[in-house]
Design a protein with these regions (language model features):
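Conserved binding/recognition cores within well-folded domains
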Residues: 1-77, 81-83
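Eukaryotic intrinsically disordered, low-complexity regulatory linkers and tails enriched in Ser/Thr/Pro
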Residues: 1-5, 88, 93-100
Length: 100
């Protein structure tokens, strides 16, 4: 559950595509809807299952099984490109090698 506009909203991990940082807030992008939540990306990412999500940029966490294409420094999710940050490339590369 996440707190959105004074309500506790249930979001299934399998519905999450990407989580983006918005300073003291995050935007949780799901298949059907986006949610703005008052928390930090680091804090929220730490609460997620590590086998399902990976930090790919200082402002982005992605659902591993939702990544469709990897093109150099971008991961494409739902046909949209998300930049893979330099300090996250090595762990991302290891994940891709181990995922296959």
């Amino acid at each position: 559950f996440v707190r959105v506009n004074k309500l506790n909203v249930k979001i299934n991990y399998d519905d999450i595509l990407v989580i983006e940082s918005l300073k003291d807030y995050i935007k949780i992008i799901t298949k059907n809807k986006n949610f703005i939540v008052h928390t930090t990306l680091t804090s929220f990412t730490e609460s997620l299952p590590r086998n399902k999500f990976i930090r790919i940029h200082r402002s982005t966490t992605a659902a591993i099984d939702k990544i469709d294409v990897i093109d150099g420094s971008n991961a494409y999710i739902n046909k949209l490109p998300y930049k893979i940050g330099g300090s996250y490339k090595e762990s991302f590369k290891n994940l891709v090698v181990n995922f296959n």
